Amino acid sequence: MYMYWGWGEEPTMKTITLGSTGITTPQDAFGALPIQRISTDEAVRLLHRAYEGGMTFFDTARAYSDSEEKVGIAFEGMRDRVTIATKSGAKDPESLASDLETSLALLKTDHVDIYQFHCADRVYRPGDGTGMYEAMQEFKRQGKIGHIAITAHKIGVAEDAVASGLYETLQFPLSYLATPREEALVEACAKANMGFIAMKGLAGGLLHNSRACMAYMTKFDNVVPIWGVQKKSELDEWLSYMDQGTPALDEETLAFIASERAELTGNFCRGCGYCMPCPMHIAINQCARMSLMLRRAPSQAWLSEHWQAEMAKVDSCVECGLCMTRCPYELPIPQLLKANRADYLRVLAGEVSVG
């Protein structure tokens, strides 16, 4: 399905129905994690610009500091015009209920459209003894939430959530670097009439070709990507596809994606940060992928005194393994840190050129 802005005009942006929720939205949505890093005035202007540009789906979370508050201020008085999804990482029903009440107050609303278990490490079910799913059912009965949903980073948890038939949407990382297993997860959601909300569409900042990222998402008729935005220039890039039309996944784009996959497959850090904090204060989510950042972004910023000091902390790693127990991608983080540190030193010494 496509959106039409006027009689006789060409179709512009593909629209998606999120499974059994019945929620329809352009396949171009707003991830509100980054707005916690900007002022309230800046965030509200950005959110208004997103809405005026055609975005109607906004995803936030209790864990994103003041993101919910900013979303609430932006859409007060126009709640029925937007879809709001939020999340809680609570581990017991009482905390889950408290989080929901806080979210509702900050969002200035009496309900959220989609309420998600945040970064779940298990799939809650009725009768499992936790009371978590029953709490969600009660929230829904009270009209405080529209749909029960889940977000995950571990594919085994995501697959279990789909198979359970208990959730109306799944939020999971998806980009054109996806593995066959991850793409099969999207198809499983489609067969289960379950909406798929795609996070990490830029693979944690490693991908820079927005047109290719957007075109890849059009492969799927059940996927809504949420793009993390904190700058007007970033937003305008995504909004441009509302006017220009959904980019085609043509031969040129497919060839580009193939070249990117060849470079970036394997054990690379996505920068999600779930491994942190580190007992030795290492910025793992950047240090473990520094070699990629040096080569895929302007390198000068990563060679600053600040990042030289941060990379030096890698030498203090005691290989306690705590980070590996937290990593949803089961990466060998201490080895990645050492390899990136060694490469960084070679770059600093001028032995390796990164352009």
Where do the PLM segments sit?
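Conserved, mostly hydrophobic/aromatic
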Residues: 18, 30, 58, 71, ...
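Structured C-terminal cap/extension of enzyme domains
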Residues: 51, 55-56, 184-198, 202-355
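Glycine/proline-rich, positively charged
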Residues: 38-41, 52, 91-197, 202-205
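N-terminal binding-site loop/beta-alpha segment at the start of enzyme catalytic domains
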Residues: 2-82
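Short catalytic-loop micro-motif centered on adjacent basic/acidic residues
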Residues: 56-61, 85-86, 146-149, 169-172, ...
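Generic structural signal for well-ordered alpha-helices
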Residues: 13-15, 47, 68, 72, ...
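Alpha-helix-loop-beta-strand connector modules within alpha/beta enzyme cores
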Residues: 69-86, 134-142, 191-193
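Short hydrophobic/aromatic-enriched beta-strand-loop microsegments
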Residues: 81-84, 167-175, 246-252
